[in-house]
Swiss-Prot record:
Highest taxon of source: Bacteria
Name of the encoding gene: dapF
Similarity comment: family membership: Belongs to the diaminopimelate epimerase family.
Protein name in UniProt: Diaminopimelate epimerase
Enzyme class: isomerase
Amino acid sequence: MKLHFTKMHGAGNDFVVLDGIQTPIDFTPEQWAAIADRHFGVGADQLLLVERSTRPDVDFRYRIFNHDGGEVEHCGNGARCFVKFVTDRGLTDKRTVRVEVMNGIATLTMQDDGQVTVDMGAPVFEAARLPFLPEGLPTRTQGDDTQHALQINGRTEWLSTVSMGNPHAVQIVDDTEAFPVLEDGPLIESHAVFPRRVNAGFMQIVDRHSVRLRVYERGAGETLACGTGACAAVVAGIRRGLLDSPVKVATHGGDLTIAWAGDGQPVMMTGPATTVFEGTLDLDALKLTAAH
């Protein structure tokens, strides 16, 4: 069986996008991981599935699968690619669409310059909703932000915890390029205080409207950009009193602009979405079977 796919990226965070409206798809985690494999599959940080919405007030259902095949709650860079995909394929003629994600609704808007703005919703800080188990950890307060300390590779690392629909732990570092992200990232990601694992963000503050960011993503490793990670980092910086909205977030894959008016308000993310190529996936060659 052959399946059409589109390869896209948002600031270097790359995706395989599949139209589950035209061809209903129900892969196992192992099958999703095989497609994402960069040597034996198409290759991607994550895979995006477009489906019909289950709600009358929403345009589409937006599902995200990590490189390891696990389904996750949200992906901001993927959301920008999602709206470009449904627009380019003629699945909608709306400039703004509402999509159903695992834990709520996201609003996506195509701008006249080709950039995409995503209403990421209001950040959540309650530990139980990440989930995060802070009992017994050292704590400190900076501005409106409460941080917790973990011992990682013999260092004390102070983390701000934020959910942007998926869990993030953000720390401020002096130099993102010099910091051992690839060593510390997986230790934070899989630490016992995060029962469902966590995305680990490492932010360098340039000035009050500009930061550099690297993110070690849950189930994907370090990626060139992470939209929800950029949102979480800016929220943490604003709550600490170190940043003012809007903030330019420089990642290895490109720049994102994040705006946030404060607690209880939605985070707005603006950035690029690019179609790289389209192709046909031979499911039999990958030893995959699509369930219809």
